[in-house]
A protein has these predicted regions:
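An acidic, carboxylate-rich microenvironment
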Residues: 31, 165, 229-230, 352
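Conserved, folded interaction/cargo-binding domains in eukaryotic regulatory proteins
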Residues: 148-176, 335-363
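Non-Sec secretion/translocation targeting segments of pathogen effectors
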Residues: 162, 349, 383-398
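Long, highly charged low-complexity segments enriched in Glu/Asp and Lys/Arg with interspersed Ser/Thr
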Residues: 168-199, 355-388
Length: 398
């Protein structure tokens, strides 16, 4: 699936740019849910978003309606990401035709639903990649026998034809349009957008898309955790007697950080075990803490992930402390409390104080909250095995 654009996502209830998230669209449902968690909001109406950069389909920029929700835009980019080069040209042509229609009928801006409808109709067009002008179009129609009224002309007369005029007449009669990548004309009526299907609640912890090494047509989707029977069924679908006969082509985990770590198909039994652990963390309300610990401790391998799972009780996590200002307020309230805390807060070098507090606790701020080791050791170093028995988390000044 192609990446379409970079999107900045933030909470409209705060002006703190550091609390925003950069995402490459389209994103999975889990990635979207994770982004909402990072910006500390659940309601789509509380979200501010903007496209920072288009990798393709740049011509859509002037037509992004301010009322478009982030979910609608993600659905649109998901449609666009599946288009090939010819279909992308068709999309640009269809959009230009729709803009022309709106201008003629004074219908106002293009709507989100129209953009999605156009993207679903790209196969209802003909694209002439080598035709870029009225003259090119005229020659194409004459030389390919589409102007039967000119077939009787002797060969010597063709050089005298005004191909630009012929092309202009044909383009206007069939309502075609030129794009930077060729001429586009509709061959069928556009079909309306299918009824919207609301997103269903996700039951899997990790979804893997797999493909046979030697046969790209053999693909399968495996939702984890899975039974041994289901895993054997997927092997049959892939025609892969052993897991090393297949490869991952996609990963969607409830902890998006894992998407880039789960790459080796021979780790599949351990990944299934990981999915079971994630399910247990979700049920116990510890999933956000695990996300924060994974992000703060530089997990780079599957072994690192299992280490953090095993030693999760040895980390402290404060979900309400997501920035330095919250850290300073919390620390002052713990140390002084009341009016004294408010007074000192007004006159304090908060940036320097926050840095010192983080250093003292060996802590790090993550989009999910603050993390530190229970023994106040360096976060970027593994917790030694002999310290695992310390099950009680010491209380910090928060």
């Amino acid at each position: 699936m192609r990446k379409v654009c970079e999107v900045y996502l933030g909470s409209s209830s705060t002006s703190d740019d550091e609390r925003g998230v950069e995402l490459t669209f389209p994103v999975s449902q889990y990635e979207m849910m994770d982004a909402f968690e990072q910006i500390y909001t659940k309601a789509p109406g509380d979200v501010y978003w903007q496209v920072d950069e288009f990798y393709c389909f740049y011509y859509l920029a002037p037509h992004l309606d301010e009322s478009m929700s982030i979910f609608e835009f993600n659905s649109l980019t998901e449609q666009l990401s599946k288009l090939d080069e010819r279909q992308e040209t068709a999309m640009q042509g269809l959009l230009q035709m729709q803009v022309n229609k709106h201008m003629q009928e004074n219908n106002g801006p293009i709507t989100t639903q129209e953009l999605m409808m156009l993207a679903s109709n790209v196969d209802h067009c003909q694209v002439l990649a080598d035709v870029h002008s009225n003259e090119d179009l005229g020659k194409f129609y004459v030389e390919n026998g589409f102007r039967e009224d000119l077939d009787a002309l002797p060969d010597s007369a063709y050089a005298l034809l005004d191909y630009a005029k012929i092309g202009k007449q044909m383009r206007e009669s069939e309502a075609g349009t030129f794009t930077p990548h060729g001429y586009v004309v509709r061959t069928e009526e556009l079909e309306p957008l299918p009824d919207y299907e609301p997103q269903r609640e996700i039951s899997y912890m990790i979804r893997l898309t797999l493909m046979n090494h030697e046969n790209e047509q053999k693909t399968a989707v495996l939702d984890l955790p899975a039974t041994e029977q289901r895993m054997q069924e997927v092997q049959k679908e892939l025609d892969a007697p052993e897991w090393f006969d297949a490869q991952f082509t996609g990963c969607d985990a409830i902890v998006p950080k894992l998407n880039t770590l789960l790459t080796d198909v021979e780790d599949l039994p351990r990944i299934n075990e990981l999915a079971q652990s994630l399910q247990e963390l979700k049920a116990s309300g510890q999933l956000t803490k695990f996300k924060a610990v994974v992000g703060a401790t530089q997990c780079e391998t599957l072994d690192d992930v299992f280490d953090r799972l095993e030693k999760l009780p040895q980390y402290c996590f404060e979900t309400k402390i997501r920035d330095k200002d919250a850290l300073v307020r919390d620390e002052l309230e713990f140390v002084l409390g009341g009016k004294d805390a408010d007074l000192i807060y007004k006159h304090l070098n908060r940036e320097a104080y926050a840095e010192d507090v983080l250093k003292q606790y060996g802590a790090e701020l993550t989009p999910y909250g603050m993390v530190n080791r229970a023994d106040f050791g360096p976060l970027h170093e593994p917790i030694p095995e002999q310290k695992q028995e310390q099950s009680q988390e010491p209380q910090m000044g928060m």
